């Protein structure tokens, strides 16, 4: 039975004045220094799923991928801040861990605790658990959109959003088997189905349905139950994103369409010098042509 050969995934992340790209077994962060030169940090990356193959199973792999992406992303941000001149030295592993803990606490407080706290003040729906969870999900989504809109008002984040667009355009060029030139990259869409923006939006939607089965206990129990179920929600969202990256089915396209629209907020059209940085990062991680494909 013939199996379809597909191009191996390359993912990425916009950082301060640069782009991080992650390919099979390697990660590279390219940053434009104040002097104008491009500096690159490249390192081999081994996933925990290589040691424990059971973690490659659907839904489990999503939790692993999310954790590893956060760790690698924080390291890339630390390097980019130093290279771009915003910081004198990179963060240590302990500083990265502390930053991740603080960021997690902030996310739990704003996107989990606050919405479920606000809902209790809405009259007329307190006896309908389904409606309560639906309203909570809508509030969570509104807070998320306000957060994205708010940070997008700052000049520094606007430049990050431009690099985000450059990252997507460059990955599109790679996936289309086109030469990685500024001209080719510039012509591609700045939206991408496997973007983290899509992932976060799908998390918001999936959480509404998952949390609906929890009933409506007291505030503390609601917060704890939602935190404990986030790996489940993330695992489901990851599988949806993974499917979206490989399927042309109209139903799948419909699911990810809202996330693509949302990317108009989280990406900007990049300048040519920003595209050059994204190209440099991808060139460092792209697998050789002999190993660029895998069987579906």
Tell what function each PLM region has.
Residues 1-78:
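Divalent-cation
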Residues 2-11, 15-21, 25, 35, ...:
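Polar-ligand-bearing catalytic/cofactor-coordination segments
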Residues 53, 66, 73-94, 120, ...:
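Multi-pass alpha-helical transmembrane bundle typical of ion/small-solute transporters
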Residues 58-81, 246-265:
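A transmembrane-helix-recognition feature enriched in membrane-embedded lipid enzymes
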Residues 75-83, 103-127, 203-225, 234, ...:
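Juxtamembrane "helix exit" motif at the C-terminal ends of alpha-helical transmembrane segments
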Residues 84-89, 118-135, 214-224, 243-253, ...:
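Membrane interface segments of multi-pass transport proteins and intramembrane proteases
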Residues 95-111, 192-203:
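Select subsegments of transmembrane alpha-helices in polytopic membrane proteins
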Residues 133-144, 223-237:
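Small-residue-enriched core segments of transmembrane alpha-helices in multipass membrane transport
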């Amino acid at each position: 039975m013939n199996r379809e050969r597909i191009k191996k995934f390359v993912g990425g992340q916009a950082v301060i004045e640069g782009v991080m790209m992650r390919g099979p077994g390697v990660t590279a962060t390219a940053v434009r220094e104040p002097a104008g030169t491009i500096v690159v940090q490249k390192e081999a990356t081994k996933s925990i799923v290589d040691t424990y193959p059971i973690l490659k199973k659907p839904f489990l792999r999503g939790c692993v991928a999310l954790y590893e992406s956060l760790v690698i992303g924080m390291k890339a941000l630390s390097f980019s801040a130093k290279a771009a001149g915003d910081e004198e030295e990179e963060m240590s592993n302990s500083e990265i861990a502390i930053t991740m803990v603080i960021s997690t606490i902030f996310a739990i407080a704003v996107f989990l605790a606050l919405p479920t706290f606000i809902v209790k003040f809405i009259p007329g729906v307190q006896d309908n658990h389904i409606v309560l969870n639906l309203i909570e999900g809508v509030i969570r989504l509104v807070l998320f959109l306000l957060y994205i809109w708010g940070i997008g008002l700052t000049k520094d984040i606007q430049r990050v959003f431009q690099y985000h667009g450059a990252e997507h355009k460059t990955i599109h060029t790679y996936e289309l088997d086109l030469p990685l030139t500024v001209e080719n990259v510039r012509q591609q869409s700045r939206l991408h189905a496997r973007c983290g923006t899509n992932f976060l939006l799908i998390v918001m939607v999936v959480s509404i349905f998952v949390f609906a089965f929890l009933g409506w206990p007291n505030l503390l129990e609601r917060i704890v139950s939602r935190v404990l179920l986030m790996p489940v929600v993330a695992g489901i969202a990851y599988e949806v994103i993974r499917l979206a990256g490989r399927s042309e089915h109209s139903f799948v396209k419909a699911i990810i369409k809202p996330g693509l629209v949302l990317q108009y907020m989280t990406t900007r059209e990049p300048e040519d010098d920003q595209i050059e940085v994204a190209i440099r990062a991808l060139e460092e991680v792209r697998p050789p042509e002999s190993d660029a494909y895998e069987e579906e």
